[in-house]
Amino acid sequence: MKGTFQPSRIVRKRRHGFRSRMSTKMGRRILNRRRAQGRRVLCA
């Protein structure tokens, strides 16, 4: 049985990247919350 994490840079960027976050209302909320926390990295 293989592990659960099968790395793929394309899938990572598409699912968790900045543009996918900006494309939904909830995603923008995530970004704003991370900005408020003072995160250096906002998303993948």
Curated annotation (Swiss-Prot):
GO cellular component terms, semicolon-separated: ribonucleoprotein complex; ribosome
UniProt GO molecular function: structural constituent of ribosome
UniProt cross-references to Pfam families, sorted A to Z: Ribosomal_L34
This protein's UniProt keywords: Ribonucleoprotein, Ribosomal protein
InterPro entries named among the record's database cross-references: Ribosomal_bL34, Ribosomal_bL34_CS
BP-aspect Gene Ontology terms: translation
PANTHER family found in the cross-reference section: LARGE RIBOSOMAL SUBUNIT PROTEIN BL34M, MITOCHONDRIAL RIBOSOMAL PROTEIN 34 FAMILY MEMBER
HAMAP family found in the cross-reference section: Ribosomal_bL34
UniProt similarity note: Belongs to the bacterial ribosomal protein bL34 family.
Protein's recorded name: Large ribosomal subunit protein bL34
